[in-house]
């Protein structure tokens, strides 16, 4: 389960959020299947469930440079809708609002360098 609080620095539509979700990840070789159940308010997960119902909410890509990837999508008219830090603070996630163009959000995952 994701954890709320300032340590995860969750931002939804430009404002701090306490949104949470239960998460299960199944590793299937080079593909990870992530199942989310929103249990809090103000997140792209809850927004998708409320407007679209159950289904594929995002496709995730690991990136080395989140700012560069975010700028790429911004140039295509797609902005950041939801972002934060991993619960163990070793990386970040950024959701791009690409539902109008791609029917799903794009999630950018960044792992911090190992210390």
State what each model feature region is.
Residues 20-31, 48-65:
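Vicinal oxygen chelate
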Residues 30, 101-103:
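Glycine-centered tight beta-turn/hairpin loop motif at sheet-sheet or coil-to-beta transitions
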Residues 1-29, 68-97:
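Core segments of cupin and vicinal oxygen chelate
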Residues 42, 55-68, 74-80:
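Surface-exposed interaction/gating patches
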Residues 34-38, 60, 71-72, 97, ...:
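A structural feature that tracks compact, well-ordered secondary-structure segments
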Residues 45:
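Zn2+-dependent peptidoglycan hydrolase active-site motif and core
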Residues 3-4, 38-40, 64:
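Histidine- and/or cysteine-centered catalytic micro-motif in compact active-site loops
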């Amino acid at each position: 389960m994701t954890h709320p609080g300032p340590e995860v620095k969750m931002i939804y539509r430009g404002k701090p959020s306490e949104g949470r979700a239960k998460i299960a990840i199944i590793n299937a070789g080079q593909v990870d299947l992530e199942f989310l159940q929103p249990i809090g308010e103000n997140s792209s997960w809850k927004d998708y469930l409320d407007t679209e119902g159950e289904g594929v909410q995002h496709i995730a890509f690991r990136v080395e440079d989140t700012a560069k990837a975010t700028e790429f999508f911004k140039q295509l008219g797609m902005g950041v809708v939801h972002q934060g830090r991993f619960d163990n603070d070793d990386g970040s996630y950024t959701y791009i609002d690409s539902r109008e163009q791609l029917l799903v959000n794009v999630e950018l995952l960044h792992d911090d360098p190992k210390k």
